[in-house]
Amino acid sequence: MFYSFCKVGQYMTYFKFELIHRSKKSRARVGRIHTPHGIIDTPNFVAVGTNGTVKALNNTMLHDIGLQLMFCNTYHMMLQPGTDIVRQAGGLHSFIQRKLPIITDSGGFQVFSLAYGSVADELKSRGTKKQGGCVLKITEEGVLFRSYRDGSKVLLTPESSIKAQKDLGADIIIPFDELPPYHIARDALKKSLDRTHRWEKRSLEAHLKNPQEQAMYAVVHGGIDPDLRKESCAILTELPFDGFAVGGSMGKTKDEMHTLLSLTLPLLPEDKPNHLLGIGDLPSIERSVPLGIDTFDSSYPTRAARHGILLTKQGPLNITKSEYATNFNSIEKGCLCPACHHFSLAYIHHLFKARELTCMSLATVHNLYFMVQLMEKYRKQIQEDLI
């Protein structure tokens, strides 16, 4: 079954969602997202390449291991090298030499995270990061912030965010939104949500003036308030977005997140793809796939790799432990990633102890290959109605 979406009365040929199978056991589903740069099988994991690259890897390696969708951050690309330079290079795909699909965010997440700290920071009472406080003013027009690179003032609006994402030329783009802190009064949260909806509408209007063979996902907000989540779904599903991302705070625990997703996902159109923003650790994926999430993005597998944590079917292992100094087996038997195909645990352990940069590349390519294979396993289990 194919679902294709219209923009201003025009038939879209460049972005389609194809439903392959819906599980008889849960809301889990297998699908395909068709984009100008290829197909994304769902459910799937999205690697985060903040500055146009996944840390420690080049983009040809992502292609070789079959990682179908990559997430790049508009905020960072705006400040360095500048989206105009990327546009002159022919867009992100040409600039970073990636042939497969790319999704970019609006820049709002990074701006507000630097201002308030991440939800994780707040829950752990860390407060804002040392670059925090860079947001100077939030108005109806947008957000005025100070660049962490050179201290210059930058005004980010729905229109300028979309202009930047047009310069980047990703397959899927995100409207400008506000990310309020976790601990916020309901009145303030409602005010933030209303402004986010206005910003998302302005973003959509700017996008539709020049679709440029890009799809735009709305971002559902509302924090941990069920009524506001419902309101956000009701407002955004009335607009001609091509898909829906679930964003904002999802609670303190995985149980709270599960409850919010169980409420939110049935309110989204079944004929359009959805995405869970910034959540892609293994337990969260395991609990969210049965709810019908199509794609997940997270820096967890790559960040863990750089700290010596390798993902395996038996659970994560810490390669820096001395027990691996004389283990000449591969990371995981049967794994076909470059690290497992060529090198032993002992060698990778040695590289970490010697602080050789190669250790991060080998650990990262293994963890991402693990994620690719994990999502393939989930798709197979859904098609067999086991999930």
UniProtKB/Swiss-Prot annotation:
Enzyme Commission code(s) on record: 2.4.2.29
Binding site for Zn(2+): C335, C337, C340, H366
Keywords (A to Z) from UniProt: Glycosyltransferase, Metal-binding, Queuosine biosynthesis, Transferase, tRNA processing, Zinc
A GO molecular function held by the record: tRNA-guanosine(34) queuine transglycosylase activity
Residues that coordinate or bind substrate: D105, S106, G107, G108, F109, D177, G248
Superkingdom of the source species: Bacteria
Span list, region RNA binding: 278-284, 302-306
Pathway(s) annotated for this protein in UniProt: tRNA modification; tRNA-queuosine biosynthesis
Enzyme class, spelled out: transferase
Cell wall biogenesis/degradation found in the keyword field: no
Catalytic-site annotation from UniProt: D105, D297
Cofactor dependency: Zn(2+)
Cofactor details (free text): Binds 1 zinc ion per subunit.
Keyword field contains Manganese: no
Gene Ontology annotations of biological process type: queuosine biosynthetic process; tRNA-guanine transglycosylation
Annotated catalysed reactions: 7-aminomethyl-7-carbaguanine + guanosine(34) in tRNA = 7-aminomethyl-7-carbaguanosine(34) in tRNA + guanine
UniProt family annotation: Belongs to the queuine tRNA-ribosyltransferase family.
Function recorded in the entry: Catalyzes the base-exchange of a guanine (G) residue with the queuine precursor 7-aminomethyl-7-deazaguanine (PreQ1) at position 34 (anticodon wobble position) in tRNAs with GU(N) anticodons (tRNA-Asp, -Asn, -His and -Tyr). Catalysis occurs through a double-displacement mechanism. The nucleophile active site attacks the C1' of nucleotide 34 to detach the guanine base from the RNA, forming a covalent enzyme-RNA intermediate. The proton acceptor active site deprotonates the incoming PreQ1, allowing a nucleophilic attack on the C1' of the ribose to form the product.
Subunit structure, interactors included: Homodimer. Within each dimer, one monomer is responsible for RNA recognition and catalysis, while the other monomer binds to the replacement base PreQ1.
The name this protein goes by in its record: Queuine tRNA-ribosyltransferase
